[in-house]
Amino acid sequence: FSDSLLAIARAGAGVNNIPLEACAQEGIVVFNTPGANANGVKELVLAGLFLASRDIVGGIEWCKANKEDANIAKSAEKAKKAFAGCEIKGKKLGVVGLGAIGAEVANTAIALGMEVYGYDPYISVNAAWRLSRDVKHTTSLDTICQECDYITLHVPAVDSTKGMINKDALDQMKDGVVILNFARDILVNEDDLAEALKSGKVKKYVTDFANPKSVNLENTIVIPHLGASTGESEDNCAKMAVQEIMDYLENG
């Protein structure tokens, strides 16, 4: 590090790409920007919910593949049966992690008519105030696994959460469950998940993390880390980071 470096601001919530121990040894303060990109990620999670429930992508690809068919309108009426899905209204959604993003996902899912369960043993007072009173708070991940049709992950990548979705957790889940991971890829044991996808235990896996394993999983929608890839999210993160640095330099 340069001797003049006093602080580092990370434009995002995760700080796993910053050498925290080295910074601490040098007295360099590290900031992140939690919540600045929450709306952008929330909207992509909702898109994932819809993509997993309705085979929209399959239908679009069918149209592209049959664009030379002069009778495509008639053909589509027969073909569309293969892309039938289900509605999310009335389904049970389990939100694991009720920070800024998880709370927004939970509240919006309530507004869409879903029955929402929330699990977060470390929920803050501010996060609790943001959460709809209609969210059913549970103290056990097991309850989420056993009760929910959809499970979405919104926890940080730490030792206690690495591989939290493993064979034991998957075995407790409903047949045909949908799992969404827009937090960190290492939260899911992808070897165990591969078996659950193959057997049909997990109907669909939606992830915002492309890696050599995820892109080869069956019944999986892989998105190239687009959660915060909006102009609004980038602006919000930059503004928060600048404000944090200025406040530290001016006030300590």
Where would I find each of the regions flagged by the language model?
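Short beta->alpha connector loops at strand-helix junctions that form conserved
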Residues: 11-12, 27-39, 183, 225-227
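N-terminal Rossmann-fold NAD(P) dinucleotide-binding loop
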Residues: 102-103
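NAD(P)-dependent dehydrogenase/reductase Rossmann-like domain
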Residues: 215, 227-252
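Glycine-rich Rossmann-fold phosphate-binding loop(s) that bind the pyrophosphate
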Residues: 98-99
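Rossmann-like adenosine-cofactor binding region
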Residues: 117, 121-213, 229
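An N-terminal-biased, well-structured beta-alpha scaffold segment characteristic
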Residues: 1-32, 146, 166, 189
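Phosphate-binding beta-alpha-beta segment of Rossmann-like dinucleotide-binding domains, i.e.
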Residues: 34-92
